[in-house]
Amino acid sequence: MTDNELSALVVDNGSGMCKAGFGGDDAPRAVFPSMIGRPRHQGVMVGMGQKDCYVGDEAQSKRGVLTLKYPIEHGVVTNWDDMEKIWYHTFYNELRVAPDEHPILLTEAPLNPKINREKMTQIMFEAFNTPAMYVAIQAVLSLYASGRTTGIVMDSGDGVTHIVPIYEGYALPHAILRLDLAGRDLTDYLMKILTERGYNFTTTAEREIVRDVKEKLCYVALDFEQEMVRAAASSSPERSYELPDGQVITIGNERFRCPEAIFQPSFLGIESSGIHETTFNSIMKCDVDIRKDLYANTVLSGGSTMYPGIADRMQKEIITLAPSTMKIKIIAPPERKYSVWIGGSILASLSTFQQMWISKQEYDEAGPPIVHRKCF
């Protein structure tokens, strides 16, 4: 019997990327964009096997003739039919397993609408016939992956940023904070500030190009004002980027102006505090006795924490806010892009976790709301 035969499937459905694989593995087998592409034009060549919709990497590669849609926005599923297609693609094309033979661990952002996880549960049991499933909170899994039981996790992906303090394995729900400001908003902002340079990006396919520019060239400035002055005085921050058609664009202070928006959301016209202040606010909502441990274990996770310079900037900002004697440590593991998935893989393979699964039998007896009773 191979190890994959009975192992759990771990699926981290992000707003931007879907990470999937087997519990117990140290990395996801499949990582692909959580997108559905539909042709914008009429197919004229018969026998080419054109589909009415493409999923993931295939949609990405044919994006020039497709309209791309992401079924998950700000961590909440907005189109369940498309979501089901993504799950189908995950199980049958990427992992090549039968979902009715494996327990399935899914992930979710905290403070999501309750109906979201009920519907997830319903689809898993009714459409995919899974024998058992569980829904875990993303930030909690990141803490598992970092090997800690106490810490505050700042998880920022493509759709949602959330901050979850955990003490000795207990999440502190009153102090969980959520910002609907993440990678996708930064991509849109970069699209906007690139138009100031005379580069026009408008279609859903061009947005993907801008996302690539963002991932390859953006960084977080340690001191934003100083960096702006430096950029105005010299051309050192300038970098060039070759578009798919060979045209070369130049990008300068946009490289750090774009991610600055997660520290200063007012750039996007969003009235909220930046990630540093939100993290501080979350710590201040916790009991005075445990704050010290949270300051010393601030864990970053998610794709939007991959900008060079973000950990140093975070450290600097929190030192400014916190009491002067406090020891502050920002933990930014190199694999933090996948730490939610890795935490899920660890959780699914723990022997003590096996009684936590929601079984098909329990679902049949209680229906979708069972998920609120059994999952944190």
Curated annotation (Swiss-Prot):
Keyword terms, alphabetized: ATP-binding, Cytoplasm, Cytoskeleton, Nucleotide-binding, Oxidation
Main location: cytoplasm
One Gene Ontology MF term: ATP binding
Domain of life: Eukaryota
Cross-referenced SMART domains: ACTIN
Post-translational modification: Oxidation of Met-45 and Met-48 by MICALs (MICAL1, MICAL2 or MICAL3) to form methionine sulfoxide promotes actin filament depolymerization. MICAL1 and MICAL2 produce the (R)-S-oxide form. The (R)-S-oxide form is reverted by MSRB1 and MSRB2, which promote actin repolymerization.
Pfam families linked to this entry: Actin
InterPro entries according to UniProt: Actin, Actin/actin-like_CS, Actin_CS, ATPase_NBD
A GO CC annotation given for this chain: cytoplasm
GO biological process annotation, one example: cell motility
Compartments, as annotated in UniProt: Cytoplasm, Cytoskeleton
Family annotation (CDD domains): ASKHA_NBD_actin (cd10224)
Keyword Cytoplasm: yes
Entry-annotated residues carrying Methionine (R)-sulfoxide: 45, 48
Cytoplasm listed as a keyword: yes
Additional information: In vertebrates 3 main groups of actin isoforms, alpha, beta and gamma have been identified. The alpha actins are found in muscle tissues and are a major constituent of the contractile apparatus. The beta and gamma actins coexist in most cell types as components of the cytoskeleton and as mediators of internal cell motility.
Assembly: Polymerization of globular actin (G-actin) leads to a structural filament (F-actin) in the form of a two-stranded helix. Each actin can bind to 4 others. Interacts with PFN1 and PFDN1.
Family label: Belongs to the actin family.
Chain's role: Actins are highly conserved proteins that are involved in various types of cell motility and are ubiquitously expressed in all eukaryotic cells.
Name of the protein: Beta-actin-like protein 2
Organism: Homo sapiens
